[in-house]
Amino acid sequence: MKNVTDSFVSLGHWPSAGSFGFNTDILATNPINLSVVLGVLIFFGKGVLSDLLDNRKQRILNTIRNSEELREGAIERLEKARARLRKVEKEAEDYIVNGYQEIEREKLNLRNSIGKNLERLENYKNETIQFEQQRAINQVRQRVFQQALQGALGTLNSCLNNELHLRTISANIGMFGAMKEITD
């Protein structure tokens, strides 16, 4: 504390002008010494400070240039990615549309195929029914004919004697012979 008070006391006292030198006591220096020190600092420090500032400026400019290049590269990659995305979205949309169209086509083909199969089955069923009806009719006719024939033979056998029987057979043979000649 004593040094601080001594420094303030020495401010009021001017040293004698016997020699030129630097006073290292900052509080005891006069404005001329301060201006000389500041002038020397500015003269010599200006180049160093200017170099430091120029280096810093160059580093900042290089960083900005690199950032700009990186930004441009990122923008370019982003545009390429967007273009690929649009292309992929379009392809996906085309696949979806084509898929739906294919599904509709397959449904239509399936419906047509089912319709044709049903129609064939219906025709087969109708043909089978007709065939079975015709067969049943033929069986009924054959039974009716056999029964009628047996009934007629029974009636003829009971009603006819041998001579009448032989004449009827001869007449029938003659009729069948005439029919055969007509058909030939």
UniProtKB/Swiss-Prot annotation:
Keywords: ATP synthesis, CF(0), Chloroplast, Hydrogen ion transport, Ion transport, Membrane, Plastid, Thylakoid, Transmembrane, Transmembrane helix, Transport. One of its GO terms (molecular function) is proton-transporting ATP synthase activity, rotational mechanism. It holds the Pfam family ATP-synt_B. This is ATP synthase subunit b, chloroplastic. The chain crosses the membrane at residues 27-49. GO terms for cellular component: chloroplast thylakoid membrane; proton-transporting ATP synthase complex. Belongs to the ATPase B chain family. It is found in: Plastid, Chloroplast thylakoid membrane. F-type ATPases have 2 components, F(1) - the catalytic core - and F(0) - the membrane proton channel. F(1) has five subunits: alpha(3), beta(3), gamma(1), delta(1), epsilon(1). F(0) has four main subunits: a(1), b(1), b'(1) and c(10-14). The alpha and beta chains form an alternating ring which encloses part of the gamma chain. F(1) is attached to F(0) by a central stalk formed by the gamma and epsilon chains, while a peripheral stalk is formed by the delta, b and b' chains. InterPro entries: ATP_synth_b/b'su_bac/chlpt. The gene is atpF. In plastids the F-type ATPase is also known as CF(1)CF(0). F(1)F(0) ATP synthase produces ATP from ADP in the presence of a proton or sodium gradient. F-type ATPases consist of two structural domains, F(1) containing the extramembraneous catalytic core and F(0) containing the membrane proton channel, linked together by a central stalk and a peripheral stalk. During catalysis, ATP synthesis in the catalytic domain of F(1) is coupled via a rotary mechanism of the central stalk subunits to proton translocation. It comes from Nandina domestica. The keyword Calcium does not apply. It is a single-pass membrane protein.
